C-alpha cells in the first residue's frame, strides 16, 4: 500500500485521537452530567468509533495497562457485552464480576463490595444495580472512575447517549426533532436519561402511556404527556418504545399484555400517525406482540433497533476513552 493510499482504519484512528477529550466529570452517573457542547463532542467521538468498528482491525491502546471491571448485579446482554467489547477494543484488561458467584450472594453489602474491589485498584468500574443511586454510592467509595450502566428506575446514561447517536446518524441532527417515548415510563431508567439528554440536545420530547405507567407529575420533566397513541404519535419524528417491565411491577398496572398491545403496542396503523420518514427505536430486550409488532421492529426502512445495538459499542468506547483522557490529564 502506498503512502497516499486510502486507509479507512488509519483515518478513523487519526480522527479518534483528534477528538478525544477529558470527560467533564470524574464519573458518568447521569445524562445530566453533560451540557450541550460536551454531549455533541462525545457524539462526534462516538461517530469516529463507529467508523473504526466497521474496519477489520478495531483495536486501540487508549486503555492499555488499565483495568475495567464490569459489576452487573442485574442480568444484561447488550449493555454488559458492549462494555466488555468497548474495553477490549480500547486495550483494557476487562474483568467481569458475577454477583451470583461472589460474596454478594453470601450477603455482602454493596459498600463492603466496593471497599474490597477498590483495594484491587481498578481504573474503571461499570456498575448496574437494581437500586436507584447504587452507582452514585459506589462512586463515593472507590478511587476509580464509575460509569452508571443502569441503577434501578433512576438512570441509564450510556443508553441515552447511544440513542442520541442513532437518531443523529439517521436524521443528521437531534435538535428540532420530536421524540415520542412510549410505554412503561414509570419503571424506565431509559426514559429518564433520554428525556434529559434529548432536551440538552434540543429535541422536543413527549411521553406516551397509560396513566398507571406514567410517573406522577411527569410534566415537570418538561415534556408533553399523552395517554393515547393517536395524539402521542401525531407528527413524531422518532417513536421510542419501552419494554413493559413486569419484573418491577407489584400490582395490576395493565389488565393483560394482549390488552396492552391493543392500545399501546406499536403496529403499522399506529405508526402511520407519526411524521413521514419516522424512525422506530427500542432499547431491548423486546417483548414482541406486547410493545411492538415484529413487522415494524424488523423493517429496516423504519427500525433503528439494530443500529442501536451497534451504536452501543461505539458510544461506550467514547465514554471510556474520555474517562481515560481524564485519568491521563490529556485531551483538549
UniProtKB/Swiss-Prot annotation:
One of its GO terms (cellular component) is cytosol. This is Aspartate carbamoyltransferase catalytic subunit. One of its GO terms (molecular function) is aspartate carbamoyltransferase activity. It catalyses: carbamoyl phosphate + L-aspartate = N-carbamoyl-L-aspartate + phosphate + H(+). L-aspartate binds at residues 106, 189, 243. One of its GO terms (biological process) is 'de novo' pyrimidine nucleobase biosynthetic process. Pathway: Pyrimidine metabolism; UMP biosynthesis via de novo pathway; (S)-dihydroorotate from bicarbonate: step 2/3. Its EC number is 2.1.3.2. The lineage of its organism: Bacteria, Pseudomonadati, Pseudomonadota, Alphaproteobacteria, Caulobacterales. InterPro entries: Asp/Orn_carbamoyltranf_P-bd (IPR006132), Asp/Orn_carbamoylTrfase (IPR006130), Asp/Orn_carbamoylTrfase_sf (IPR036901), Asp_carbamoyltransf (IPR002082), Asp_carbamoyltransf_Asp/Orn-bd (IPR006131).
